[in-house]
């Protein structure tokens, strides 16, 4: 598996981790969730990312999750494994373990958080991870969560590494445009911002690594199809209706809102693990009205005037 496997993936879902009320992983809930995603235009699946609440998962739990999902997916779509932390040595050891585990198109490695490395420190961190195994690496650049930002210039240095095949970019559309304009041909650029997917695809991005595709994959697929067919009027009309849903899904720390919607839809997404908590009941009801029912009046009570948490 390689760049070519992922090149065809426009909608990659950053999969939640379903939990029981006691906080243990609900493995019995995973098959229905996976089939739902595949039935609604998910082209690839990211495991043990931020939406999976990876900071609260042990490596052993992540490996159990990997095995369970691989068995269910059975090669139908490419899988990406979250492999990075803010500890370079730990990241190297885990990426080696995941590479030996097998079955993944790539590993996703986040920009180191909390310890605030320099650009050179970040470059050396990702180079060391990419050098450690033959598992292709996608970099996750999300300064809203990690405080520091990998600049486009540093990203392009890393893009020359033969084992670094892409980026999940959550900075600005200006940075994304620069990367798309100057990147090597076989380097994937995904947006990690659902609300920016329309703009990113029009700039030439390869796709989106998405939370909203858990609940609104059909709309995203329809919008991307319209863009591919140069029907901008249709694509923009879908985007206008999609944005309030995205805002609702991120009106409370993620993945609490999407889990609330999935639970309402009949899937056993369960609660979040501390320190995240479920959305309050009244907020959850409003989120569901927007995301499921398209009740945009509920948007005003849910998201208007609320500073959306970074995800």
Swiss-Prot record:
Keywords, ordered alphabetically: Amino-acid biosynthesis, Cytoplasm, Diaminopimelate biosynthesis, Lyase, Lysine biosynthesis, Schiff base
What does the record give as EC number? 4.3.3.7
Gene3D superfamilies of this UniProt entry? Aldolase class I
Annotated catalysed reactions: L-aspartate 4-semialdehyde + pyruvate = (2S,4S)-4-hydroxy-2,3,4,5-tetrahydrodipicolinate + H2O + H(+)
* Stated family: Belongs to the DapA family.
Describe the function of this protein: Catalyzes the condensation of (S)-aspartate-beta-semialdehyde [(S)-ASA] and pyruvate to 4-hydroxy-tetrahydrodipicolinate (HTPA).
* Protein name as catalogued: 4-hydroxy-tetrahydrodipicolinate synthase
């Amino acid at each position: 598996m390689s760049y070519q496997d992922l090149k065809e993936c426009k909608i990659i879902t950053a999969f939640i981790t379903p939990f029981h009320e006691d906080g243990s992983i609900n493995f019995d809930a995973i098959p229905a969730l996976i089939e739902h995603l595949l039935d609604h235009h998910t082209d690839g699946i990211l495991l043990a990312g931020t939406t999976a609440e990876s900071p609260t998962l042990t490596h052993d739990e992540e490996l159990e999750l990997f095995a369970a999902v691989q068995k269910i997916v059975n090669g139908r779509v490419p899988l990406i494994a979250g492999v990075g932390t803010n500890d370079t040595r730990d990241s190297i050891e885990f990426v080696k373990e995941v590479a030996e585990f097998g079955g993944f198109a790539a590993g996703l490695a986040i920009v180191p958080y909390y310890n605030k490395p320099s650009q050179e420190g970040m470059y050396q961190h990702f180079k060391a991870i990419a050098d450690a195994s033959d598992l292709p690496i996608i970099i996750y650049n999300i300064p809203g969560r990690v405080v520091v930002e990998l600049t486009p210039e540093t990203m392009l240095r890393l893009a020359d590494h033969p084992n670094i095949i892409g980026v999940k970019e959550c900075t600005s559309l200006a940075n994304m445009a620069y990367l798309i304009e100057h990147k090597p041909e076989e380097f994937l650029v995904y947006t990690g911002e659902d609300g920016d997917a329309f703009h990113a695809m029009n700039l030439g991005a390869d796709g989106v690594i998405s939370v909203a595709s858990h609940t609104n994959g059909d709309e995203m697929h329809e919008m991307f199809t319209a863009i591919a067919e140069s029907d901008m009027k249709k694509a923009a009309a879908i985007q206008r209706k999609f944005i309030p849903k995205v805002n609702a899904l991120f009106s409370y720390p993620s993945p609490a809102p999407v889990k609330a919607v999935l639970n309402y839809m009949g899937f056993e997404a369960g609660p979040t693990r501390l320190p995240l908590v479920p959305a309050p009941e009244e907020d959850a009801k409003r989120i569901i009205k927007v995301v499921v029912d398209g009740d945009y009046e509920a948007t005003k009570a849910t998201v208007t005037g609320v500073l959306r948490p970074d995800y």
